[in-house]
């Protein structure tokens, strides 16, 4: 995939458009801020060091427990080349088939799974109106969309040519977002917009299990997997952390959550999302029904050796209105959550960028790249950073 200035502008327009969509659906924020512009990504390099496939399961792996997903057929794809893979049974919100993108290497058993971001929708207007608040709901997402997706060359974690990318020599999986439910739903419902019925598939979590089946068959030896995502994909990484860990029983799964902040939205909004999407929350986490903030303590207790990294702006101009919070309210909630990280979450750290924007990985600072590298490498110098 070649990166051009038009691609840079396309991703900037994507986030700007999402902000306008949110406003058009009756939500507003009390601050100002501009969406970020992407950093580019040249073509992948040709070499990579060999990993040791005999490494025993690291701390955090569940070892011999029964996997929750059965391994399916392995994915076969060209080396170090982005390849689209249709996944049987996976659907977008419009019911059309979808799949995943892979960039594989035989030189490592380590895996990065990256979940695409792009808003959310929960009723007729937000899903099927003229300005839907979730990406790819109207269009679906297949090979055509994959081949022109502006996020892939913009996110540096997906760029094999970036010497600062700790995943440049690992297997990379890109999970597109077209279900409008932050990868959490399993429900088919019908919305009527202006007299037209739209069957809507909130199948994000169902799709994840289908993808996991193929990934288990493709990476049977992996002992290290990182689940990352931005915006809705960041929330999806948090929602599906346990699902991945229980599936990859011989691996340790760590999470990089960019702009899917585990803070609680307006209670009515959270209740609506849970109901409309049939949100699939961890069965053994009763408090998770109260809001995303409960996930922090749940993961801390259940996976004490797994790492959880959060990236956020001080004032998130996209997430605040989605949660029906003003920017000031968002900042206060974020600060409270960060304080809780400091006192309660030994293996969870954050990197907070100053200002009002959204998604740090598209224009990463040198300091952010250093922080991500420290997290992935297992460095004991990995710590929290905020303005």
Task: For every predicted segment, state its role.
Residues 26-28, 40, 44-387:
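C-terminal His-loop and adjacent cap/lid subdomain of alpha/beta-hydrolase
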Residues 22-24:
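C-terminal motif of bacterial Sec signal peptides marking the signal peptidase cleavage site
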Residues 31-35:
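Long, acidic (E/D-rich), serine/proline-rich intrinsically disordered low-complexity regions
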Residues 2-15:
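Bacterial N-terminal signal peptides that target proteins for export
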């Amino acid at each position: 995939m070649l990166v051009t200035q038009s691609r840079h502008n396309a991703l900037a327009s994507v986030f700007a458009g999402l902000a306008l969509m949110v406003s058009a659906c009756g939500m507003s924020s009390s601050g100002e801020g501009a969406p970020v512009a992407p950093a580019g990504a040249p073509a992948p390099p040709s070499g990579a060091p060999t990993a040791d496939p005999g490494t025993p399961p690291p701390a955090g792996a569940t070892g011999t427990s029964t996997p929750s997903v059965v391994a399916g057929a392995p994915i076969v794809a060209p080396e170090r080349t982005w390849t689209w893979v249709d996944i049987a049974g996976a659907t977008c919100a419009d019911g059309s088939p979808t799949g995943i993108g892979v960039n594989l290497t035989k030189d490592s058993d380590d895996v990065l799974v990256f979940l695409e971001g792009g808003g959310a929708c929960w009723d007729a207007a937000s899903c099927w109106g003229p300005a839907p608040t979730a990406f790819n709901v109207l269009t679906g997402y297949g090979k055509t969309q994959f081949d022109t997706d502006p996020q892939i060359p913009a996110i540096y974690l997906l760029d094999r040519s970036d010497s600062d990318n700790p995943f440049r020599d690992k297997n990379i999986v890109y999970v597109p977002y077209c279900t409008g439910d932050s990868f959490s739903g399993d429900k088919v419902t019908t919305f009527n917009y202006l007299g037209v019925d739209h069957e809507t598939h909130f199948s994000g979590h169902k799709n994840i299990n289908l993808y996991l089946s193929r990934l288990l068959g493709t990476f049977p030896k992996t002992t290290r997997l990182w689940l990352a995502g931005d915006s809705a994909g960041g929330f999806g990484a948090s929602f599906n952390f346990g699902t991945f860990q229980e599936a990859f029983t011989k691996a340790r799964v760590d999470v990089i959550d960019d702009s899917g902040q585990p803070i609680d939205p307006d209670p009515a909004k959270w209740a609506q999302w849970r109901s409309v999407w049939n949100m699939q929350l961890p069965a053994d986490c009763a408090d998770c029904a109260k809001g995303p903030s409960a996930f922090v303590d749940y993961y801390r207790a259940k996976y004490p050796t797994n790492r959880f990294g959060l990236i956020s702006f001080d004032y998130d101009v996209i997430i605040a209105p989605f949660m029906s919070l003003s920017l000031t309210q968002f900042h206060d909630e974020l600060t409270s959550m960060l304080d809780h990280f400091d006192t309660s979450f030994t293996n969870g750290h954050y990197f907070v960028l100053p200002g009002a924007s959204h998604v740090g990985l598209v224009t990463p600072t040198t300091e952010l790249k250093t922080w991500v590298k420290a997290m992935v490498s297992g460095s004991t110098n990995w710590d929290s950073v905020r303005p």
